Amino acid sequence: MKLPARLALMVALTVPAGEPALAAASSSVQRPATVSEIGQFFNERQGRAFWFASDHATESLLELLEQASLDDLDPSLYPIATLRRLAMNARSGSARDRRDAEAAFSAVFVQYAGDVARERNVGTLYVDPAARPRPVSAARLLRVAATAPSLAAFVEQMRWMHPYYPALRRALAGEIKSGNQPRRVRLLALNRDRARVLPRGTSDYILVNSAAARLDFYADGKVKDTMRVVVGEAAQQTPMMAGMVRYAILNPYWHVPPDLAQSRLAPRVLGEGLIYLRKKGYEVVSDWSRTATVIPAESIDWKAVAAGKVEVKVRQRPGPLNGMGEVKFMFPNDLGIYLHDTPSKALFQKSERTFSAGCVRLEDAEALKRLILGDTPMTASTQPEQSVSLSRPVPVFLAYFTAFPQGGKIVERPDVYKRDAKDAATLSVTRS
């Protein structure tokens, strides 16, 4: 069903025709669809008040709009004065006035929510289209808001966003008000923008914060489990990326990267002999496939390997010494990045955990396996490289937060990858 012509026009006139805050970006809300979805939403409510069931809901939205600079948006491009006039008419006028105001507040709310949620260029690489945040849907946003215990609280606390976002926004407001810490203002604004790409809603997902070297597993919108991780060293950084964990490999081989075979493995062979390879479970292979042929290690010119003149493929057999541990979780990407178990548990006790070649080593891989594989049927076996497909892929976000909420306050972590200054330079300056 469609809105009556006058209400449809009100919605269309109330939502700015141009991009309200980011001149270079297209609107995240398709305006014809917005009009139709808002009309359908109010038809379903059969005349029941939404915004005007409580005065606090309208004031919560107006306050957000007035402070839209905290979202790096321009408040002057939202029709705040028009909304206040419509709200006044709704409270003292006819049922028609209230319907007009309900439609207008809904349209601006959907527009603002979409503007806030639109991702900024913070360097996240999406290796799976399914992991990319979807534009805000008017129908879904309004229905979720309508089921909240308090619409005012839903709006005020920006519950359509990941919890990191409103927490960083509030902290940013406090710093701007104090006016004495420009460094922290820049830090909070940058990490606020990094939070825009995080999942919204209640689906399961994995969030790795490389700056803090921690992993959180979210279920039903809350952290269900957390663990330490080891991430890439400064020269081989864990990238900011998002993908979908689609399968796990039990009893994996570790395919030694060619540069490590040259810089670490070959010198050990030259110093200790071929017994080093046997002792550590390494074998030279023809290729990386599961049907690869094992090549006698004595046939390799290890001096040439160490000198970088010969490239050799080496894998480590499954077992207690294997660098991958007992399981690795795969989200297909061209960078060769994944989550995996590790036998090197002592590293998790260190405060700074940047020791990997880019992949994410897990403190408790068994716990993550239970969380994401759940009831997936598996056969107990010691066979190498058992692939187990997930019945439902799980989004994974490798993020980089040098400021984030924890225990009711904003904590900071060292910028171990020296990304903050570079990333901040690509973003617009937060308005004050």
Task: Give the positions of each predicted feature.
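Positively charged n-region of N-terminal signal peptides that target proteins for export
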Residues: 1-6
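Well-ordered beta-sheet/strand-loop patches within structured domains
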Residues: 25-33, 103, 107-111, 130-136, ...
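Membrane-interface motif at the C-terminal end of an N-terminal transmembrane signal
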Residues: 19-20
